[in-house]
């Protein structure tokens, strides 16, 4: 396989149901749409869903059930707020030794990455598609792994070390909401260190947000993020009756224009993978992805 693609979900209760390919239900329509658009090239791409909802879903849904008979209005909105704030506050890293939720979520992500690695080689370029809170989670996961890596290097298994990370597409991403507690904001190092020059030339962190999505934000205005995020794309998503409403937050997965955007980027990476080793040019200094993390922060 020439390319590995991992998909991570965001807020909301997600069933832990998988198809014969091991894909969770939230990812199936998007993966099917990408395969249709890629045609024969789809055979060069391995997909894997990353699932973490089970860590928090049971607690949130149990509470919602307990308040069913209470005199509460706007229940659909209250449910959405509970699931988002419940996921966000439950996931936060705390110092209490007994609270391991942060580590549990990351272990679920790690398990998905390992399942993907079992299908591809250690040098395979990796693309991560991250929705909503999943963008914050995967950013933290990559950050923690990069701390373990200490210095950029090509280890025995650079894929598991996330040093073959060639693409990151965040959509409906709310990373900015988690930065305001810090005076200095530092992004992950991007792209990975172990990429061929041709793949590195095409490496991109792309951020997509629907203008009506109250949980999707531009990333480049964040301190230091313009050095690693290549594009903030405002893209209305969903059918006409949701496209200009907050409901658009859940519509990226099913939107044809978003599918086209993703497929176009995957094609560029696949084409770069066809170039001989050593082909292509390195990103010149000053372009996103070329400056060491130490220079940014």
Predicted ranges, named:
Residues 5-28, 93-199:
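Serine-dependent carboxylesterase/thioesterase catalytic core
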Residues 4, 46-48, 204:
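A generic secondary-structure signal marking the coil-to-beta-strand transition
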Residues 43-45, 163-164, 201-203:
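A short helix-to-beta-strand connector/capping loop
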Residues 17, 167, 173-287:
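Lipolytic serine-hydrolase domain surface
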Residues 2-6, 80-81:
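Short coil-to-beta-strand
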Residues 1, 98, 119-123, 271-297:
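Defense-system signaling and execution modules centered on TIR/cGAS-STING-like, death/scaffold domains
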């Amino acid at each position: 396989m020439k390319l590995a693609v991992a998909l991570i979900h965001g807020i909301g209760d997600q069933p832990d149901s998988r198809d014969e390919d091991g894909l969770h239900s939230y990812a199936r329509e998007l993966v099917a749409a990408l395969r249709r658009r890629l045609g024969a090239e789809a055979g060069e791409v391995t997909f894997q869903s990353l699932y973490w909802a089970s860590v928090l879903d049971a607690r949130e849904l149990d509470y919602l059930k307990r308040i069913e008979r209470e005199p509460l209005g706007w229940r659909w909105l209250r449910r959405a707020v509970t699931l988002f704030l419940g996921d966000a506050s439950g996931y936060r890293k705390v110092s209490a030794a007994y609270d391991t939720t942060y580590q549990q979520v990351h272990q679920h992500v790690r398990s998905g990455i390992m399942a993907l690695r079992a299908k591809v080689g250690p040098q395979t370029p990796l693309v991560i598609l991250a929705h909503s809170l999943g963008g914050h989670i995967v950013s933290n996961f990559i950050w923690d792994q990069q701390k373990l890596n200490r210095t950029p290097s090509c280890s025995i298994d650079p894929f598991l070390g996330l040093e073959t990370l060639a693409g990151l597409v965040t959509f409906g991403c709310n990373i900015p909401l988690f930065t305001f507690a810090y005076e200095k904001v530092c992004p992950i190092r991007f792209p990975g260190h172990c990429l061929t020059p041709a793949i590195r030339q095409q490496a991109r962190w792309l951020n997509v947000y629907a203008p009506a999505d109250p949980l999707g934000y531009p990333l480049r205005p964040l301190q230091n993020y313009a050095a690693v995020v290549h594009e903030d794309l405002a893209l209305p998503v969903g059918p006409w009756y949701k496209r200009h409403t907050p409901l658009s937050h859940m519509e990226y997965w099913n939107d044809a224009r978003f599918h086209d955007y993703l497929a176009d980027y995957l094609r560029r990476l696949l084409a770069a993978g066809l170039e001989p080793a050593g082909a292509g040019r390195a990103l010149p200094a000053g372009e996103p992805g070329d400056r060491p993390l130490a220079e940014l922060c």
